[in-house]
């Protein structure tokens, strides 16, 4: 959570969020957001080994987010994949899709994005 608060100005970090609405459910590994001037929300998906369906899963969560959390409709929404191990081609695919990549090593969370990275706001 330190990297989320220091890098993105996040005020609230909530792990393991589960929500049900109209017979549907959504599970988030981490929901982080700020209501202050940054006014953004970040969904963090944690994977030990990134596979192609992991990228698709996060994109689906990002697309459904506002249906389940209308109270955050005014926020810019970003995705972060936090992984222990990711093949370079999948890492590049996620970055090209505008998803932040973070590495997990010894329980440390570190952003791994190139200087020219352009995140996508959903």
Predicted regions span which residues?
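Domain-level recognition of nuclease-like catalytic cores that cleave nucleotide substrates
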Residues: 77-122
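Amphipathic, low-proline, heptad-repeat alpha-helices and/or compositionally biased low-complexity charged/polar-rich
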Residues: 1-7
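Short, solvent-exposed coil/turn elements at secondary-structure transition points
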Residues: 18-19, 49, 85, 107
């Amino acid at each position: 959570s330190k990297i989320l608060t220091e890098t993105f100005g996040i005020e609230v970090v909530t792990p393991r969020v589960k929500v049900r609405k109209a017979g549907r459910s959504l599970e988030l590994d981490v929901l982080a957001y700020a209501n202050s001037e940054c006014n953004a929300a970040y969904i963090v998906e944690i994977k030990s080994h990134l596979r192609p369906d992991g990228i698709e899963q996060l994109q689906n969560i990002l697309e459904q987010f506002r249906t389940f959390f209308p109270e955050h409709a005014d926020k810019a929404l970003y995705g972060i994949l936090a992984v222990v191990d990711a093949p370079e081609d999948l890492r590049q695919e996620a970055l090209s899709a505008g998803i932040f990549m973070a590495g997990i090593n010894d329980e440390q969370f570190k952003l791994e994005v190139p200087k020219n990275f352009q995140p996508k706001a959903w």
